[in-house]
Amino acid sequence: MRLTEFWQRMAVAFGPHSESLAEYHVFSQLGGRTIRQALADGEQPKGIWRGVCEALEVPAHQR
């Protein structure tokens, strides 16, 4: 998954809250990091997206 696709999926799933979610929400599925921290640490967007979907119970049709 490309980074642009990741951000598109975030926007569809979380709308205007996607940016603050990425900046401030700490996910146990991402090793106790935020989305931005995980990306900065070199994690792949696809793995991050899977963690976000699991944590926030994103509906299957949006995954």
Give the location of each predicted region.
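C-terminal alpha-helical interaction appendages
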Residues: M1-R63
